[in-house]
């Protein structure tokens, strides 16, 4: 049987004439019904596409990442059980290639979101209680690379692959943990959700967010993101959902991470 191509609606054109499995939104737990069902899989796309391919592939997986999610080189897939995020053990890709042609055409919003994702991989692990000498060195390398705000999408994807290697060493912590309820409850994209806490976290850690991100853009995104949260959903309920993710406790913030601390980070 021919290879199965796992793609998104925007990357399906690169698999013309092939058998395809199209990932249209965040990955449901239902994907486990076809775990290890295909001998050879090729993935072209971002994190959700590659996470799906890692679950489906049985023998060989070739990945062409188009964002900086780093999923090709991590050892788990993110799946959703309703509004709850779960990490499912999965394989790493056998081959990872960055094709410049597949990386063109990303919207400015997707470019920004994927930059946020790899930045969060570096920050979450750099300040993790589980960080090692090796992981800290890689975190710092990624942050230095990201100081180039004008790098091409293909270069950003390469940096994202380093981020995948990083989170295979040390699990993500604060930013990722806080983002999951925003994605699960309101369908706010992963990178967008994390961007809301960047300025507050950088202020707390005495880091200059302007080194990596445009201040005006961050401010406007926070305003837009707050508008996506329904008024009838109380802040206390949202904070309760955020605090359920134990991984946030591994972040070395200097004091206990409480609802009040999270409110300050998000400017709520």
Task: Go through the PLM ranges and name each one.
Residues 30-103:
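Glycine/threonine-rich beta-strand-loop-alpha-helix active-site module
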Residues 79-170:
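Carboxylate- and glycine-rich phosphate/diphosphate-binding segment that chelates Mg2+/Mn2+
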Residues 47, 119, 176:
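Short, conserved catalytic/metal-binding motifs centered on acidic residues
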């Amino acid at each position: 049987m021919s290879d199965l191509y796992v793609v998104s609606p925007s990357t399906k054109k690169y698999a013309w004439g092939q058998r395809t499995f199209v990932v249209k939104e965040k990955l449901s737990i239902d994907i486990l019904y076809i775990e290890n069902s295909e001998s050879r899989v090729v993935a072209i796309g971002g994190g959700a596409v590659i996470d799906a391919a890692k679950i489906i592939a049985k023998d060989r997986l070739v990945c062409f990442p188009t964002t900086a999610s780093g999923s090709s080189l991590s050892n788990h897939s993110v799946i959703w059980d309703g509004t709850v995020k779960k990490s499912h053990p999965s394989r790493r890709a056998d081959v990872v290639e960055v094709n410049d042609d597949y990386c063109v055409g990303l919207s400015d919003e997707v470019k920004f979101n994927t930059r946020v994702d790899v930045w969060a991989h570096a920050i979450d692990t750099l300040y993790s209680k589980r960080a090692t000498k090796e992981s800290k060195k890689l975190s710092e390398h990624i942050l230095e690379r990201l100081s180039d705000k004008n790098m091409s999408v293909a270069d950003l994807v390469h940096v994202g692959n380093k981020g995948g290697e990083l989170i295979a060493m040390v699990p993500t912590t604060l930013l990722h943990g806080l983002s999951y309820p925003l994605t699960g409850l309101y369908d706010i994209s992963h990178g967008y959700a994390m961007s809301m806490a960047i300025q507050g976290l950088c202020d707390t850690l005495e880091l200059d967010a302007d080194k990596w991100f445009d201040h005006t853009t961050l401010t406007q995104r926070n305003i837009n993101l707050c508008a996506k949260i329904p008024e009838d959903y109380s802040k206390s309920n949202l904070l309760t959902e955020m605090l359920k993710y134990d991984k946030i406790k591994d972040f070395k913030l200097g004091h206990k991470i409480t609802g009040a601390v999270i409110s300050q980070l998000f400017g709520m």
